[in-house]
């Protein structure tokens, strides 16, 4: 349901009510004319009146004629006052955008960019400011709608509006705009954006993932998010997208500017394309049959140089000064020939059929001292995955508007310029690298063990060493292999594949051809990049980007089916490299968790941390204590961790020592009559001076032992007051007497 009304003079609002049946309704309200009046278009978007975003769209007055791309910039500004917080940075003000903000920028950019007229060269900037936020609501999908609405009002040549919704599969129902609390019960979560085309809603962008709890919910009987279920979710999103688009249209009709005349710069004129086609078509068609990327690109460069020389300076120099046009026409001809061959001959650049996968290779343990590593290759795409394990205290701390304050699994993706044989900047990650890392992270989170099952912080790094199509999905495969090599007990292995799409008008009807495992060139010249990751049982993540105004959902459903077949093939190759978790690397720390009563936490810590510091110093272990009484003990080796656990248990779960028990104790005090030895925290015993000399009389205790020395002792007696008498045990002499016979008496380390 939608509604539009005029408030004060010049202030208009439109409302979209989204009905989720048993899950209630969500209300999205768009208001314009009150804030940011000097922007070309501005909208305040509300979600149930608590979450409030301001979106402002502006455009430069003069075009950037020298650009060969559309200069669209999307920025998301998270204001901490939106959640009633002061930033945690040193200067107590917002700094660089958070990962959530960067990912939201990408969510907005991807459906908006193809909606602008082709050839626009004026700089366009969309700035979304988060001004108020209900802590239960993700703001990203509201931002998509706000950005579309402000752009629709701006007078720019924009074929919107674009509607965006988050859909969560909860108890068998697809729910729009779910809260974080509802997402805790969700099996699948996806953001879908689209626009109204005729009587249908065309899908423009999808970003989807299974949740941390998906595997457990499916095991308990919930519907697994299979390809068919995901396709049904795309259909379920359409009515909500339609409602949101209609509200934006009504607002634009009431308050929008007329579309202004903006100069459009076609990449080339028709005469340039005709000249290039006549000069190079035959040679280009042959070059596009070369399977090797580098050989093909070298040959294309040669042909392009010859074409520029021929039509740019020869034949009366009719294209002199129009070299950029000739270059753009050459690229357009390349695109045309690639697409024609796919549509007509069902053959791709490297000679594969539509559903064929390139050669696959998987190997683990490729970096000597890494906790886990793997190399995954698909054709010329080569990804190195490296896993690092450590204490949970090293998990990432997050200072953003998200309710998530820590991140245990961190996935970082690097794309150096040499991966494509080029030079370029290296250093801090760009938005693309952050987005690709987040996609691979979402693909793996549903199969990770819980904190209780595997109490480690996990850092996964994906190094794109060679790129020719879908390094992000290659990263998913390499990461699965690497984590298994590190000994991480994944619930199931995950693989990913990138799908493409080529469309053409034949007899007045649009025909679509889906491609499995696309090359970089097929991504560049095709209409869609559709990445799907999952296990054998269900989809864990997917991402859709399109250059079209939208793609019918039945075409996406077909692509999902092709992706499933390819994923199964890749999983088989990965299983040959490693089928189950390896033993943990000797270089990885050993982390163990134990639970103690909450009222014992203070005793374990001790006054001013004295007790926990002494345990750390004596054993070399690192200890982290949670508020619920969970204690994580990490050490370089198992014995050190066990020693620390014994000491903690002796404090929190004390057991009285018994006569005959043996301990490796520490001398804590000497006196004229003997030495006091610490057996357990808070439990000392006395070795009388007469028992220190191995039967020989000694005059002074310090002649035999000093404070800090380790002694192997046995409890000889415990009197009625609990005082413990000890005797020194000479294990070597005793073992010699027994001829190496095994000792049955229990020993404990203090």
UniProtKB/Swiss-Prot annotation:
Catalyses: RNA(n+1) + phosphate = RNA(n) + a ribonucleoside 5'-diphosphate
Keyword Transferase belongs to the record = yes
Q: Where is the signal peptide?
A: none
Q: Which GO terms describe its cellular component?
A: cytosol
Picking any one GO molecular function of the record gives: RNA binding
Q: Which PANTHER family match?
A: POLYRIBONUCLEOTIDE NUCLEOTIDYLTRANSFERASE, POLYRIBONUCLEOTIDE NUCLEOTIDYLTRANSFERASE 1, MITOCHONDRIAL
What job does the chain carry out? Involved in mRNA degradation. Catalyzes the phosphorolysis of single-stranded polyribonucleotides processively in the 3'- to 5'-direction.
Please state what the protein is called: Polyribonucleotide nucleotidyltransferase
Q: Which organism is it from?
A: Saccharopolyspora erythraea (strain ATCC 11635 / DSM 40517 / JCM 4748 / NBRC 13426 / NCIMB 8594 / NRRL 2338)
């Amino acid at each position: 349901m939608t509604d539009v009304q005029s408030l004060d003079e010049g202030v208009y609002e439109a409302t979209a009510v989204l009905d989720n049946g048993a899950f209630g309704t969500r209300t999205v309200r768009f208001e314009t004319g009150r804030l940011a009046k000097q922007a070309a278009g501005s909208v305040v978007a509300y979600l149930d009146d608590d979450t409030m975003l301001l979106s402002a769209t502006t455009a430069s007055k003069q075009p950037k004629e020298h650009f060969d791309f559309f200069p669209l910039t999307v920025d998301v500004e998270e204001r901490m006052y939106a959640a009633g917080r002061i930033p945690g940075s040193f200067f107590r003000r917002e700094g660089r955008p958070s990962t959530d903000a960067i990912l939201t920028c990408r969510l907005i950019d991807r459906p908006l960019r193809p909606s602008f007229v082709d050839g626009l060269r004026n700089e366009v900037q969309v700035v979304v400011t988060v001004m108020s936020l209900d802590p239960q609501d993700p703001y990203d999908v509201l931002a998509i709608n706000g950005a579309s609405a402000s752009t629709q009002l701006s007078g720019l040549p924009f074929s919107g509006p674009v509607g965006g919704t988050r859909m969560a599969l909860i108890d068998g129902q697809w729910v729009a705009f779910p809260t974080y609390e509802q997402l805790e019960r969700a099996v699948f979560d996806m953001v879908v954006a689209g626009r109204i085309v005729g009587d249908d809603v065309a899908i423009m962008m999808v970003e989807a993932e299974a949740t941390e709890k998906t595997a457990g919910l499916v095991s308990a009987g919930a519907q697994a998010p299979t390809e068919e279920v995901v396709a049904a979710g795309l259909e379920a999103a359409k009515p909500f997208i339609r409602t949101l688009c209609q509200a934006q249209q009504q607002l634009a009709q009431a308050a929008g500017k007329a579309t202004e005349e903006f100069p459009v710069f076609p990449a080339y004129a028709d005469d340039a394309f005709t000249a290039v086609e006549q000069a190079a078509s035959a040679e280009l068609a042959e070059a596009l049959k070369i399977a090797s990327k580098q050989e093909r690109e070298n040959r294309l460069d040669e042909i392009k140089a010859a074409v520029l020389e021929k039509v740019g300076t020869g034949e009366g120099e009719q294209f002199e000064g129009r070299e950029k046009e000739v270059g753009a026409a050459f690229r357009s001809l390349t695109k045309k020939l690639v697409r024609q061959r796919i549509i007509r001959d069902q053959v791709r650049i490297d000679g594969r059929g539509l559903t064929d996968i390139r050669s696959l290779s998987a190997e683990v343990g490729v970096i000597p001292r890494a906790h886990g590593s793997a190399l995954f290759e698909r054709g010329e795409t080569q990804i190195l995955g490296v896993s690092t394990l450590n204490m949970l205290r090293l998990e990432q701390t997050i200072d953003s508007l998200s309710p998530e304050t820590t991140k245990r699994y961190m996935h970082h993706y690097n794309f150096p310029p040499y991966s494509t044989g080029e030079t370029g900047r290296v250093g801090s990650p760009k938005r693309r690298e952050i987005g690709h890392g987040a996609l691979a992270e979402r693909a793996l989170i549903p199969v990770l063990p819980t904190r209780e099952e595997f109490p480690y912080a996990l850092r996964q790094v994906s190094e794109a060493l060679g790129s020719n199509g879908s390094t992000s999905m290659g990263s998913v495969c390499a990461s699965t292999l690497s984590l298994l090599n590190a000994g991480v007990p994944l619930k199931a292995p995950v693989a990913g594949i990138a799908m493409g799409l080529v469309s053409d008008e034949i007899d007045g009807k649009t025909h679509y051809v889906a491609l499995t495992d696309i090359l970089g060139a097929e991504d560049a010249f095709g209409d869609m990049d559709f990445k799907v990751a999952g296990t054998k049982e269900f989809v864990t993540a997917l991402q859709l980007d399109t250059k079209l105004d939208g793609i019918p959902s039945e075409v996406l459903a077909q692509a999902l089916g092709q992706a499933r077949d390819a994923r199964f093939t890749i999983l088989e190759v990965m299983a040959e490299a490693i089928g189950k978790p390896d033993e943990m690397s000797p270089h990885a720390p050993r982390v163990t968790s134990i639970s103690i009563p909450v009222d014992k936490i203070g005793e374990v810590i001790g006054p001013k941390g004295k007790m926990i510091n002494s345990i750390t110093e004596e054993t070399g272990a690192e200890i982290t204590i949670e508020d619920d009484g969970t204690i994580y003990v990490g050490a370089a080796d198992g014995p050190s961790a066990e020693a620390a656990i014994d000491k903690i248990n002796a404090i929190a779960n004390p057991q009285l020592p018994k006569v005959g028990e043996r301990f490796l104790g520490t001398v804590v005090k000497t006196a004229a009559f003997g030495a006091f030895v610490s057996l357990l925290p808070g439990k000392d015993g006395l070795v009388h001076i007469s028992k220190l000399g191995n039967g020989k009389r000694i005059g002074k205790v310090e002649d035999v032992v000093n404070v800090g020395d380790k002694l192997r002792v046995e409890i000889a007696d415990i009197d009625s007051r609990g005082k413990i008498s000890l005797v020194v045990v000479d294990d070597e002499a005793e073992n010699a007497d027994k001829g190496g016979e095994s000792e049955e008496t229990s020993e404990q380390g203090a």
